[in-house]
A protein has these predicted regions:
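Catalytic alpha/beta core domains of metabolic enzymes, predominantly
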Residues: 1-120, 129-133
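Extended, intrinsically disordered, low-complexity segments
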Residues: 130-171
Length: 171
């Protein structure tokens, strides 16, 4: 993982040029670049710059996130990442911001894709049935989302996900 705004463009490019590892770009500090119209850059342009530097994955925040960014902005960011550049290359959007399975239905409904990395550390590790059930709950949530189920419908069908809803449902 490279903290893009700290390492900078030339540092990120150098890291990408050194090895064959996937470069996971974290945009910590993004808020300072985007929260005021006179200070920054839209994510659609921002992610292109980092793609040119060699980033393979980039954070886009998340639906119903813990920060200030609107869901509409997150959706635009995901769409920008998936738009091919230079012969079909895209960058993998990393959905991460207080994620658990409960955001999967809305994320899928709004983006119509599973071509993303869905980071849910707390949603996995804090699951009442332990981390294995946390992973299972996420799988169940996404299966339900792809099948058009609401959170409530998926919870009634999938026991591990139901436990997540009980624990995280108000978050």
């Amino acid at each position: 993982m490279v903290s893009l705004n700290s390492v900078g463009l030339s540092g990120t490019k150098k890291i990408a040029d050194i090895g064959a590892l996937a470069i996971h770009g974290h945009r910590n500090g993004w808020g300072m670049l985007n929260r005021h119209p006179l200070l920054g850059i839209e994510f659609a342009a921002y992610q292109k710059i980092w793609r040119l530097a060699g980033v393979d994955q980039i954070h886009v925040n998340g639906i119903q996130n813990k920060f200030w960014e609107s869901d509409d902005s997150v959706v635009r960011s995901i769409e920008a990442c998936l738009k091919p550049m230079f012969g079909g290359f895209s960058v993998l959007p990393v959905v991460s911001s207080g994620q658990w399975g409960g955001q999967a239905p809305e994320t899928y409904r709004r983006t119509k894709t599973t071509d993303l990395l869905y980071m849910a550390g707390g949603g996995i590790m804090a699951h009442p049935g332990g981390p294995a059930n946390g992973v299972l709950a996420l799988q169940q949530a996404w299966e339900g989302a792809v099948n058009g189920l609401s959170v409530e419908q998926a919870a009634s069908q999938y026991p591990a996900f139901a436990q997540s809803v009980k624990k995280f449902g108000t978050k």
